[in-house]
Amino acid sequence: MTLVIVFAVVLFGLLAYLGWINKSASTSVAAPVTLPSTPYPVGTPSARAPSRLAPPSASAIPGYQLTYVADFASSGIPKGWDLFKGEPGGDPGAQLSPNHVGVYDGKLVLATYRDKAYGNRWVAGGLCQCGLPNLYGAYFVRSRVTGPGPNEVQLLWPANNQWPPEIDFNESSSISHTTATVHWGVGNYILQTHLKGVDLTKWNTWGVVWTPKKIVYVLNGRAWGAITTPGAVPHMKMTLNLEQRTECTIHRQCPRRPVQMLVAWIAEFHRR
């Protein structure tokens, strides 16, 4: 896997993402950060698990305790999660529907397909762990996509909905390229890290370790990016969000056939 790390600081207008619009003003480059060498959890081998790896053990991260696990063994959406509906901000023409999210065969499924209820438009799914906000922690999501088209998004969003900050720890632009981005400040400063050469159609364990002084991005147990810039690290409660998005109106990230984002499990840790 080829690893390409690019840090860029971009000054945007205040409006962005869920109900806001980005307006680029300037760009500068930040110095690379030394990555932790300590391995992070990938999962526990299990022949019965849909992805062949079950959630990590309670002691998988020294100094942390396992505080939340969802393995989607039951048929319903876990308690504490809310489903998105409507047009996502910053993505005109796209559409999210609660009917495009469900739990099947031990997996959380976000499904993008042409929906007759929306005039046969491409409609995707998304949800947030809005009922379980936390301050700092380590979040791990084992997921894959079934094909190209809509992107895969895993992020932390402010619990009070006062944006920024925002931590996107897996926001793909293709099935082989993803980015991690932190937004902060009233001008929406951005630090972005790119990862190329990864196969998003295979099962991967994505993670973010968020502490008072650092944000570390993790893929399959290995740190691949880190942020230590003063002011960039959020200090407010945030919630985990999972989404698929299309940009068919501008001829990007638009599927040619139905595509799914599959999630085998979610595990969250917090310091003891």
Where are these predicted regions, by residue range?
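C-terminal region of N-terminal signal peptides and the immediate post-cleavage residues
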Residues: 12-38
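GH16 jelly-roll
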Residues: 2-5, 9, 22, 35, ...
